[in-house]
Regions:
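Thiamine diphosphate
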Residues: 32-108, 111-112, 116-117, 262, 264, 269-282, 395-472, ...
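Glycine-rich phosphate/diphosphate-binding loops that line cofactor/substrate pockets in enzymes
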Residues: 12-23, 63-69, 93, 151-156, ...
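Phosphate/pyrophosphate-binding active-site segments
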Residues: 1-6, 139, 175, 297-392, ...
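Active-site diphosphate/adenylate-binding microenvironment
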Residues: 11-15, 21, 32, 37-38, ...
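Glycine-rich, acidic loop regions that bind phosphate or pyrophosphate groups
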Residues: 103-144, 166, 240-346
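Glycine-rich, anion-gripping cofactor-binding loops and their flanking helix/strand elements
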Residues: 66, 212-301, 402-433, 446-450, ...
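Conformationally flexible catalytic loops at phosphate/diphosphate-handling active centers
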Residues: 147, 151-202, 337-339, 357
């Protein structure tokens, strides 16, 4: 609070800047290095979620940034607190998510002595953060926090790391608050849109690819109207399926792990690709084999909010520096040609998508994850948020789930294991009224599974589906491909995850047959508690189309 002389502690100034910039929620693990900041929260209307490990806190904040487009906020202590949180910072970097991580720091007079838990955060985070800094002068807090919000959200969004020396936080200073930040849009030029229309009019086999961040529900709706007018097939890139309604007749599917071969052929055979928001990195490009580098055979129009990515890998015939939200609005001014030579192909693309995703494949064992994911389509509301971490289990999720609205998919492009559980909790804290479900592998879950305690503490009834095949499945798959039959370090002995849930005060159930899943799911919903459904799946079921035995035998045969 302001004293009679108009001063506030630096910590109060800091938290007041968060209020000014519209922050309603922060995630943290407490530490003595920033106690003054914690105290400042006491008198301000910002909700705090206390987590059990800093990686969980950072991932929750990242998930909120991903869902809202505004910076997720995380506070952690110095040293090991910061290094634990680095996983979330890396996710924010590769997923283009706005995130601001505040880190406690040793007192200024102790720096460069390797004081207790001292680190140079500019050096530690310099390669994964958009900007890493340390505040020495409390009078500059409004300036630097404002810059952090603009940096995290501007251009290609990403993480900012700010170190807070503990002695600086208790200094008193008279300084005005900064104005509230307003996200800066990057609009395409009139000449860009004119050239795009000419290229579309000249095309015979165009396709649209959507990815990246800086989208909104309004932008997705505008893009859908554009696709309608031009009868364009639209695909989404890795873990960005929520950008286009899968029920839309123009939807052609998603480019990720184990994609539809017909979709890959359609992209390769296109004569024009309109790539909006994404980078078409290693995963959606199928290890950079989908397009020729540096000059694709197809006419490439690349729309991205940041010139540093335009031309970095692919030389586009038309490169447009624009945010997806601004570009989608500008699309309203484009008119289709009188004749659309590709019109008959778009329904075929959608039919290929439906044929690939409607009916789950048969897999070894009594639990078919594909049938479970497909069965949830009719049981989940359209605004349900579906989260997942990394592992082969996610191939079933991405293939058979239906993400009907923008913001209903939270999954890491970075491929970070342990993402799903904290992301689900963050989403539930952000929107308690929405259904939130997370899928996690057995190895995946135990990287951040302690955050289930956070869900119980805050009465956040997320439903976690743990897919237990008793191994690090993705690594085992590659191990069998390269070193068939030589199993090392990929087997797991797991606990009873249903009992684990009950031990924390949640709901837990074991599922050993597909038919038992949906009664257990309904019971979990009715319990009103955070829940874990423990699926015991056959380790032979590596993916919807590949078995462990077949993978090994193919490798042994030299295939």
């Amino acid at each position: 609070m302001r004293a009679n002389d108009g001063t506030r502690t630096a910590a109060e100034v800091l938290i007041d800047q968060l209020v000014v910039h519209g922050v309603a929620h922060v995630f943290c693990v407490p530490g003595e290095s920033y106690l003054a900041a914690l105290d400042a929260f006491h008198d301000r209307d910002i909700a705090i979620t206390v987590c059990r490990q800093e990686s969980g806190a950072a991932i929750m904040a990242e998930a909120c940034g991903k869902a809202t487009g505004r910076p997720g906020i995380c506070f952690v202590t110095r040293g090991p607190g910061a290094t634990n949180a680095a996983a979330g910072v890396h996710i924010a970097r590769q997923d283009s998510t706005p995130l601001i991580l505040f880190v406690g720091q040793v007192a200024r007079e102790m720096r460069e002595r390797e004081a207790f838990q001292e680190l140079d955060y500019r050096a530690v985070f310099g390669s994964i953060a958009k900007w890493a800094t340390e505040i020495d002068d409390p009078a500059r807090i409004p300036e630097l926090i404002s810059r952090a919000f603009y940096t995290a959200t501007g251009g290609r969004p990403g993480p900012v790391v700010i170190a807070l020396p503990e002695d600086m936080l208790v200094e008193r200073v008279a300084v005005p608050d900064a104005p509230a930040f307003e996200p800066v849009e990057i609009w395409p030029g009139a000449s860009d849109m004119s050239r795009l229309q000419k290229l579309l009019w000249a095309a015979e086999r165009p396709i649209v690819l959507l990815g990246g961040s800086r989208w909104s529900a309004t932008a997705c709706a505008a893009l859908a109207r554009f696709a309608d007018r031009f009868a364009l097939p639209v695909a989404t890139t890795f873990r960005r399926a929520h950008l286009f309604d899968p029920a839309h007749p123009c939807y052609a599917g998603d480019l990720g792990i184990g994609p539809n071969p017909k979709l890959l052929a359609r992209v390769k055979g296109a004569d024009l690709i309109l790539l909006v928001g994404g980078r078409l990195g290693e995963m959606p490009s199928q290890s950079y084999t989908l397009l020729d580098i540096p000059r694709p055979r197809q006419t490439l129009v690349h729309v991205f909010p940041g010139v540093e990515e335009l031309g970095r890998v692919y030389h586009a015939q038309l490169a447009i520096n624009a945010t997806p939200t601004a570009f989608a609005a500008a699309l309203e001014g484009l008119q289709p040609p009188n004749e659309l030579s590709w019109r008959s192909e778009t329904p075929l693309a959608h039919a290929d998508f439906l044929a690939w995703t409607d009916k789950p494949t048969t897999v070894p064992g009594p639990v078919n994850l594909g049938e479970i994911v497909a069965g949830l389509r009719e049981r989940l509301p359209a605004d349900a948020v579906i989260c997942n971490g990394a592992g082969n289990f996610s191939i079933w999720v991405h293939r058979y789930a239906r993400y009907r609205r923008y913001g209903t998919q939270l999954a890491p492009i970075s491929g970070s294991m342990g993402y799903g559980v904290p992301a689900a909790i963050g989403a539930k804290r952000l929107a308690p009224e929405r259904t939130v479900i997370a899928f996690a592998g057995d190895g995946d879950f135990l990287m951040t599974g302690q955050e289930f305690a956070t869900a119980v503490q805050y009465e956040a009834p997320v439903i976690i589906v743990v897919v237990d095949n008793g191994m690090y499945g993705t690594i085992r798959m590659h191990q069998e491909r390269h070193y068939p039959g030589r199993v090392v370090a990929t087997g797991l002995k797991n606990p009873d995850f249903a009992a684990y849930a009950r031990a924390f005060g949640g709901y837990g159930a074991m599922v050993e047959k597909t038919a038992d899943f949906f009664p257990a799911f309904e019971a979990a919903q009715k319990s009103g508690k955070p829940a874990i459904l423990h699926l015991k799946v056959d380790p032979e079921a590596l993916t919807p189309t590949i078995s462990l035995k077949a993978t090994r035998e193919k490798a042994q045969a030299g295939g």
